[in-house]
């Protein structure tokens, strides 16, 4: 079943064993090289869970689930047994895999979640647009606050609702349980010569009497 405007995928009658209100999707055409027409995907509750835009590579693979008011778009994907539910928004190339879960009003933008990582409450897991740093959640970590930039939250680390962990540097910050460490960026220890801008030569014209050059 699909709407007339959805030429990307259809919702099949293959129901989830535990949650029969969820059904698998099937690709109606080739999608971004990895998905072929006829390929079976993961589970959705309705078309409101996955973008149907023709040029959008967003997809739900394997046994992953998008349910409730959760929405996956802009080249993001769910793999493995990942779950996006509640009003979670997974976007901008984000990848959820393993048994990771995004729920409530969690927002993922250019982020990666794996293992049993949890993004809950009003969590925001977003990449840094300047450094292009990507936040990674793994292990059994739980994030309720904001994580931005090249930060790896892992182990049993917990980011509380009032906490903001931002990284606008070229290094990688690692938070694992109660420990914190830094992985220096490539080439950060090497000194480089100053790159001076060479200003173009200006041609001077003869100054006429009473006229500024």
Identify what each model region corresponds to.
Residues 1-57, 63, 81, 87, ...:
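Terminal amphipathic alpha-helical/low-complexity segments used for targeting or macromolecular assembly
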Residues 48, 58, 64, 70, ...:
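Residues at the loop-to-beta-strand transition
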């Amino acid at each position: 079943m699909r709407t007339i405007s959805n030429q990307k995928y259809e919702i099949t009658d293959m129901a989830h064993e535990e949650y029969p209100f969820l059904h698998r999707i099937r690709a109606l055409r080739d999608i971004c090289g990895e998905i072929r027409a006829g390929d079976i995907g993961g589970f959705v509750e309705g078309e409101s869970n996955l973008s149907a835009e023709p040029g959008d590579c967003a997809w739900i693979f394997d046994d992953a689930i998008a349910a409730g008011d959760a929405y996956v778009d802009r080249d993001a994907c769910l793999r493995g047994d990942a779950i996006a539910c509640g009003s979670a928004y997974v976007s901008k190339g984000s990848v959820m895999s393993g048994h990771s879960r995004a729920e409530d009003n969690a927002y993922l933008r250019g982020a990666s979640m794996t293992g049993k990582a949890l993004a809950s409450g009003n969590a925001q897991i977003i990449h840094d647009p300047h450094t292009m740093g990507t936040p990674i959640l793994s292990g059994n970590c739980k994030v309720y606050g904001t994580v931005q930039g090249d930060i790896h939250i892992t182990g049993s680390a917990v980011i509380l609702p009032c906490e903001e962990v931002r990284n606008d540097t070229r290094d990688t910050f690692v938070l694992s349980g109660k420990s914190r460490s830094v992985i220096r960026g490539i080439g950060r220890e090497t000194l480089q010569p100053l790159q001076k801008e060479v200003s173009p030569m200006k041609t001077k014209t003869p100054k006429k009497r009473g006229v500024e050059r």
